[in-house]
From Swiss-Prot:
It is found in: Cytoplasm; Nucleus; Dynein axonemal particle. It comes from the Eukaryota. Acts as a co-chaperone for HSP90AA1. Mediates the association of the molecular chaperones HSPA8/HSC70 and HSP90. It comes from Xenopus laevis. The keyword Plastid does not apply. One of its GO terms (cellular component) is nucleus. InterPro entries: STI1/HOP_DP, STI1_HS-bd, TPR-like_helical_dom_sf, TPR_rpt. This is Stress-induced-phosphoprotein 1. Keywords: Cytoplasm, Nucleus, Repeat, TPR repeat. Residues 189-235 are annotated as: Disordered. TPR repeats lie at residues 4-37, 38-71, 39-71, 72-105, 225-258, 259-292, 260-292, 300-333, 360-393, 394-427, 395-427, 428-461. Residues 205-235 have a biased composition (Basic and acidic residues). Residues 130-169, 492-531 form the STI1 domain. The lineage of its organism: Eukaryota, Metazoa, Chordata, Craniata, Vertebrata. SUPFAM superfamilies: TPR-like (SSF48452).
């Protein structure tokens, strides 16, 4: 095992230095010695991903999950490989599966958010991917005639499957007309005759509902029950609750199969603050409603009132249970909003209740022990537990950042350092660890800024001064080949999003062909910001 660990450390150094072939070789030899070690497959997956060998990265990510199904990192590796292979739905499912094992894993949460955004963007950015595409084209006279042309159908299928070709097809007037129809905006100067516009579809016939019986058709007991209900409503509005209860009770005696009179009684007890009696009556109303096959909306209303009664008593767990029962019967925005509000409060209550500085210290000490043994994944788990137990301790974020750096998760290390600095701006380790992570990412300018701030706190800090000088020399001697620049840039989620935007790709192509077009594009602040980002990471240069 010692030999395998030595090879793993050697592989980590090679990976950090960008020597990918050497890293893969070291991890492969280590796996031969320790074939059940999930961390080795995880690290080799990262190396393959950096080499752009995404199929192999996926194989190792899958093996990691197989060996250690409760380890979030394995799911991150597998999902990242799937994402690079453009298998976005599978990547999303993998992130979700990982979160079922590690619900608080920040990397998995961030990955899932990015994936959901990518999928939403992909759907939005490709109007030709609409499920009812041909129905839309058939319903508009401008495109209906085009559908008889096989070449037009072939063109539509091409754009449906490969939206990146749109930029090369914009000169085709058929494409502009089609976009006008699909997007619902006028993109050209074609004048349409009013009479050619199809008339609006006839209104949908109202869904037949069981007609309310006319009062004269009602049996005498039901007529009398309704009158009692109206008297109860008048008293309720005046907050004369005793009188309201009396009339609702009489209505219920006259028409015991009508659940409405029972829920009316429950509403009175709710206003009186007798929530236990309110719930008892709502349960009875639901029972009567089920027996008499009442409208599901009335059942939902009774469940919602039970939920509201628990919410008033600050019993959020029970409130959520009954709000969800109400939503299962009939979904309304009001109940959904109340349910989400209760969930938010409950989550915060559980978070606060979990805080315990003494247990945080225990977890921190366990993390320190694991870190000293070189078991960085285990150390990270202990530090994460300590943070949940004491989220305002800046040093815990610093310690976890050190773990992330050892695991080559530099972006997460930077994020933890920034939280550490926010909580304790005078803690120098927050700045030096942030700088070290940025330096490892070869972002020397930002690393120097962080080292500079550390030196402002302590001018004698050798770690800060040495790091600053090292970054200066690295920046001065930098001679990256274009592939390295591109690889580093494309690891940035913001850059990935910009480069996957068909509109931005069209703009970049236009800038290459016509440099004068740049000034026009820079007038748009959103586009200018994206261009600046691509310049900052070295993907484009403007002279």
């Amino acid at each position: 095992m010692e030999a395998a660990n030595a090879l793993k450390e050697k592989g980590n150094k090679a990976l950090s230095a960008g020597n990918l072939d050497e890293a893969v070789k070291c991890y492969t030899e280590a796996i031969k010695l320790d074939p059940k070690n999930h961390v080795l497959y995880s690290n080799r997956s990262a190396a393959y991903a950096k080499k752009k060998e995404f199929t192999k990265a996926l194989e190792d990510g899958s093996k990691t999950v197989e060996l250690k199904a409760d380890w979030g990192k394995g799911y991150s590796r597998k999902a990242a490989a799937l994402e690079f292979l453009n298998r976005f739905e599978e990547a999303k499912k993998t992130y979700e599966e990982g979160l079922r094992h590690e619900p608080t894993n920040a990397q998995l949460k961030e990955g899932l958010q990015n994936m959901e955004a990518r999928l939403a963007e992909k759907k939005f950015m490709n109007p030709f991917n609409s499920p009812n595409l041909f129905q839309k084209l058939e319903s508009d006279p401008r495109t209906r005639a085009l559908l008889s042309d096989p070449s037009y159908k072939e063109l539509i299928e091409q754009l449906r499957n490969k939206p990146s070709d749109l930029g090369t097809k914009l000169q085709d007037p058929r494409v502009m007309t089609t976009l006008s129809v699909l997007l619902g905006v006028e993109l050209g100067n074609v004048d349409e005759e009013e009479e050619d516009t199809p008339p609006p579809p006839p209104p949908q016939p109202k869904k037949e509902t069981k007609p309310e019986p006319m009062e004269e058709d009602l049996p005498e007991n039901k007529k009398q029950a309704q009158k009692e209900k109206e008297l109860g409503n008048e008293a309720y509005k005046k907050k004369d609750f005793e009188t309201a209860l009396k009339h609702y009770g009489q209505a219920r005696e006259l028409d015991p199969a009508n659940m409405t009179y029972i829920t009316n009684q429950a509403a009175v007890y709710f206003e009186m603050g007798d929530y236990s009696k309110c719930r008892e009556l709502c349960e009875k109303a639901i029972e009567v409603g089920r027996e008499n096959r009442e409208d599901y909306r009335l059942i939902a209303k009774a469940y919602a009132r039970i939920g509201n009664s628990y919410f008033k008593e600050e019993k959020n767990k029970e409130a959520i249970q009954f709000f969800n029962k109400s939503l299962a019967e009939h979904r309304t925005p009001e109940v959904l909003k109340k349910c989400q509000q209760a969930e938010k409060i409950l989550k915060e209550q559980e978070r606060v209740a979990y805080i315990n500085p003494d247990l945080a210290l225990e977890a921190k000490n366990k993390g320190n022990e694991s870190f000293q043994k070189g078991d960085y994944p285990q150390a990270m788990k202990h530090y994460s537990e300590a943070i949940k137990r004491n989220p305002n301790d800046a040093k815990l974020y610093s310690n976890r950042a050190a773990c992330y750096t050892k695991l080559l998760e530099f972006l997460l290390a930077v994020k933890d350092c920034e939280e550490c600095i926010r909580l304790e701006p005078s803690f120098i380790k927050g700045y030096t660890r942030k700088a070290a992570a940025l330096e490892a990412m070869k972002d020397f300018t930002k690393a120097m800024d962080a080292y500079q701030k550390a030196m402002e706190l302590d001018s004698t800090s050798k770690e800060a001064t040495d790091g600053y000088q090292r970054c200066m020399m690295s920046q001065y001697n930098r001679n990256d080949n274009p592939e390295d620049v591109k690889r580093r840039a494309m690891a940035d989620p913001e850059v990935q999003q910009i480069m996957s935007d068909p509109a931005m790709r069209l703009i970049l192509e236009q800038m290459q062909k016509d440099p004068q077009a740049l000034s026009d594009h820079l007038k748009n602040p959103v586009i200018a910001q994206k261009i600046q980002k691509l310049m900052d990471v070295g993907l484009i240069a403007i002279r």
